[in-house]
Amino acid sequence: MGRNGAGKTTLLNGLHLVLYGKRASHVGRTRADYETYLRESIHRGAHQSDGASVEVHFDATYDGELGSFRVRRYWTVGPDDQVNDGLAVFHDGAKSTFITDHWDEVIEEIFPLEISSLFLFDGEKIEALADPYQAAHVTRTAIESLLGLSILDRLSLD
């Protein structure tokens, strides 16, 4: 725990951003929402053209083997006000073009977006779990995500 404004939620949002990019739940649904989020995530004291980046290092089992990953998501705003973003993934110390190009599939194998909310959540979710009126819904959603039931529900609707 920490004081309000200490950056706990910002840290979690950054972790979601580096791992899931525009699929992260807090960045919005459209490309325009994502670009707005990236623009607003550049430090106020920096020039937009300097851009920003988020990087995370972790160990995970991928393709049956334990390995180390370094994932870096970066972005700048060009003179035409266009947001340019990129991703670089290093696996066991070497840049991997294949893993970078297929990152959405790779991260789904390692740490699926559907279950990330069970492990990466902020104080608001803790408050919801403590609220007897919301706890049942939050718990049900978490269990459905863990079991993949929300995916099955969506598939049955399609």
Q: What is the role of each PLM region?
A:
Residues 123-158:
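Extended, Lys/Glu-rich alpha-helical coiled-coil stalks
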Residues 15, 19-23, 111-115, 146-154:
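Conserved NTP-handling cores and scaffolds of large molecular machines
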Residues 7:
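Conserved glycine(s) of the Walker
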Residues 4:
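The conserved Walker
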Residues 1, 12-68:
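Conserved P-loop NTP-binding catalytic core
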Residues 28-40, 45, 65-118, 128-141:
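Glycine-rich phosphate-binding loops of NTPases
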